[in-house]
């Protein structure tokens, strides 16, 4: 408690905490907001991290920070800011500059996504409409409420937008810094609260065992050489009785997806999914299938699999 009070008591650190409670920010973004320049910002961030009030998240050549999500740190910050006047002039100016930084982030995301839009649209045209698939996902998961939802390979953050309103906490991971930029911008623009993203590998996610109620793996497995490892990680982090939802293509023969779009596997066979799930203590149901658009010769069937973690899961795949 004393260390936390000492760390939060410095004015610049208090401003940093106020900003990070609103959204995750890189060091560069914090510098843009905290005018004039704060040469001791790295020292402040180190002290806040050591006190358990912020979390450090490396992301390629970037480092992002967020307000603590741990039970002690979060409770301390909630209590601290409940006593502060958010209309205090300096905090209000910071909030206004944060909006400007967020607008710049959105422009960066739009520029990146415009470069891949043609590819994205071409793939979308090959399969069943996304809105209907998303409706089926929510139906299969149930309306919650969920304690914690995790999205493996979050991409644009669409699954977080869909499920965050049904959860106390929702978090997505992705290897791509560019896609995380897109996801952050989308979540901010859509006003999605309680959802965060961070860089991570779906085969070694930064979450504790038995900590999630729902894990989603949406159109990720066909990019992997060992999809079973992502399924094993999902089982590890799921609570007993927790659900895993997987969306991916049924087996197909569209070789151009491998050559031009980096698909490692041409769809996922239910038989393989069943084996991988059983190996890590997941009870897998038959998939719900969505055929390609009528008249689409080179269309793709999309499957949604639902699995539930057994009360006594088997050992995980190494």
Task: Indicate where each model-derived feature is located.
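N-terminal helix-turn-helix DNA-binding core of bacterial DNA-binding proteins
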Residues: 2-40, 62-71, 136-138
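Amphipathic alpha-helical dimerization/coiled-coil segments
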Residues: 72-122
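Conserved alpha-helix/loop element of class I SAM-dependent methyltransferases that forms part
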Residues: 127-147
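Class I SAM-dependent methyltransferase SAM/SAH-binding core
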Residues: 148-150, 156-204
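A short acidic, Gly/Pro-enriched loop at the edge of an enzyme's catalytic core
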Residues: 203-214
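A short SAM/SAH-binding and catalytic strip from SAM-dependent methyltransferases
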Residues: 213-226
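A short glycine-rich, Lys/Arg-flanked "PGG" loop and its adjoining helix->strand segment in the class I
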Residues: 228-243
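C-terminal alpha-helical "lid/dimerization" subdomain adjacent to the S-adenosyl-L-methionine
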Residues: 243-306
